[in-house]
């Protein structure tokens, strides 16, 4: 798989997440893909649970901005160090950093994404 294809898919993942576009985001995954977001919580089926996942995002965040700080592509995968800035429904701002590891399927879509970050710390920043 070409590094360009992987980079394009990673960019699509982050841009659709930032836009809170569940349909576009789900298209980045194979039918049976799983996500660990964050790692340590039970896995979720990306396509099957996309609407529920984005429903939770839209309940918590007024605005979501993501930057791909560093992207490392190797073989059929990528690791991305990212920064997320949010405006909570509370009106408070929050910032989180993390690393997401993307595993590609031969079909050119993600088969697994594992994200390492502290979601509880971000939610504490925007709590009423």
Each language-model region and where it sits:
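Short, low-complexity N-terminal intrinsically disordered segments enriched in polar/charged residues
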Residues: 1-27, 31, 126-128
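Short, surface-exposed coil-to-beta transition loops
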Residues: 65-66, 81, 94-100
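Short beta-strand edge/turn micro-motifs at domain boundaries
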Residues: 97, 101-124
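A short hydrophobic beta-strand element
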Residues: 75-84
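A short, polar/proline- and glycine-enriched secondary-structure boundary/capping micro-motif
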Residues: 90-93, 121-127
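Short, cysteine-centered beta-strand-loop-beta hairpins and adjacent loop/turn segments enriched
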Residues: 59, 85-95
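A solvent-exposed, acidic/Ser-Thr-rich amphipathic alpha-helical stretch
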Residues: 5, 23-75
């Amino acid at each position: 798989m070409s590094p360009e294809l992987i980079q394009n898919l990673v960019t699509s993942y982050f841009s659709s997440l930032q836009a809170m576009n569940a349909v576009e985001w789900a298209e980045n995954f194979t039918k049976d893909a799983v996500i660990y977001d964050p790692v340590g919580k039970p896995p979720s089926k990306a396509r099957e649970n996309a609407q529920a996942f984005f429903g939770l995002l839209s309940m918590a965040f007024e605005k979501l901005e993501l930057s791909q700080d560093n992207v490392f592509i190797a073989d059929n995968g990528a690791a991305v160090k990212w920064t997320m800035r949010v405006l909570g429904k509370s009106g408070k701002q929050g910032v989180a950093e993390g690393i997401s590891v993307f595993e590609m399927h031969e079909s050119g879509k993600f088969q697994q994404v594992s994200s390492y970050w502290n979601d509880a710390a971000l939610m504490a920043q925007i709590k009423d």
